[in-house]
């Protein structure tokens, strides 16, 4: 008989899970934080995030940086990857994509703090950067700068 662990209820990790057709169908999974009560920051970086323009259907590209200070829960990284991939065929503006990702994670994890930076590549000659966070960053945790430089063309 196998012993139940914090990973026992995960459905996607270790299985052949397909990319959901859209973000609404994506299942984000969480695991109990074995270091709950210890203040620390978790960072996920998605340098090749893609979605579709809802008007033209053309692809949009972004560099996403997600930082959070966990409470009782951690996001399972394969489920996060599949959730982010589900935006590939989803039409929404940059602001909607970025804030939706942040809100879904907050709803799932109930973190002490979370922020997401969406650094979108230019469309129509204008880069769009979108930032969402749940409040002031905790003072007792090292939270590095996101480190994504401002977009700069020639010059």
Curated annotation (Swiss-Prot):
<keyword id="KW-0521">NADP</keyword>
<dbReference type="Pfam" id="PF14489">
    <property type="entry name" value="QueF"/>
</dbReference>
<dbReference type="GO" id="GO:0033739">
    <property type="term" value="F:preQ1 synthase activity"/>
</dbReference>
<dbReference type="GO" id="GO:0008616">
    <property type="term" value="P:queuosine biosynthetic process"/>
</dbReference>
<keyword id="KW-0963">Cytoplasm</keyword>
<comment type="pathway">
    <text>tRNA modification; tRNA-queuosine biosynthesis.</text>
</comment>
<dbReference type="GO" id="GO:0005737">
    <property type="term" value="C:cytoplasm"/>
</dbReference>
<feature type="active site" description="Thioimide intermediate">
    <location>
        <position position="53"/>
    </location>
</feature>
<dbReference type="InterPro" id="IPR029500">
    <property type="entry name" value="QueF"/>
</dbReference>
<keyword id="KW-0560">Oxidoreductase</keyword>
<keyword id="KW-0671">Queuosine biosynthesis</keyword>
<comment type="similarity">
    <text>Belongs to the GTP cyclohydrolase I family. QueF type 1 subfamily.</text>
</comment>
<feature type="binding site">
    <location>
        <begin position="94"/>
        <end position="95"/>
    </location>
    <ligand>
        <name>substrate</name>
    </ligand>
</feature>
<feature type="active site" description="Proton donor">
    <location>
        <position position="60"/>
    </location>
</feature>
<comment type="function">
    <text>Catalyzes the NADPH-dependent reduction of 7-cyano-7-deazaguanine (preQ0) to 7-aminomethyl-7-deazaguanine (preQ1).</text>
</comment>
<feature type="binding site">
    <location>
        <begin position="75"/>
        <end position="77"/>
    </location>
    <ligand>
        <name>substrate</name>
    </ligand>
</feature>
<protein>
    <recommendedName>
        <fullName>NADPH-dependent 7-cyano-7-deazaguanine reductase</fullName>
        <ecNumber>1.7.1.13</ecNumber>
    </recommendedName>
</protein>
<dbReference type="InterPro" id="IPR050084">
    <property type="entry name" value="NADPH_dep_7-cyano-7-deazaG_red"/>
</dbReference>
<dbReference type="InterPro" id="IPR043133">
    <property type="entry name" value="GTP-CH-I_C/QueF"/>
</dbReference>
<dbReference type="GO" id="GO:0006400">
    <property type="term" value="P:tRNA modification"/>
</dbReference>
<dbReference type="InterPro" id="IPR016856">
    <property type="entry name" value="QueF_type1"/>
</dbReference>
């Amino acid at each position: 008989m196998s012993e139940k662990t914090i990973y026992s209820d995960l459905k996607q990790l270790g299985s052949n899970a397909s990319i959901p057709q859209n973000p609404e169908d994506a299942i984000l999974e969480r695991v109990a934080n074995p270091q709950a009560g210890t203040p620390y920051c978790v960072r996920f970086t998605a340098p090749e995030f893609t979605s579709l323009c809802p008007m033209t259907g053309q692809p949009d590209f972004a560099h996403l940086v997600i930082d959070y200070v966990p409470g009782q829960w951690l996001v399972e990284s394969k489920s996060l990857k599949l959730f982010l991939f589900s935006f590939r065929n989803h039409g929404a503006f940059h602001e909607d994509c970025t804030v939706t990702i942040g809100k879904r994670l907050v709803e799932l994890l109930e973190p002490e703090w979370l922020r997401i930076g969406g650094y979108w590549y230019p469309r129509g000659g204008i880069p769009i950067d979108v930032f969402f966070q749940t409040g002031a960053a905790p003072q007792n945790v090292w939270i590095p700068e996101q480190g994504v430089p401002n977009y700069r063309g020639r010059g």
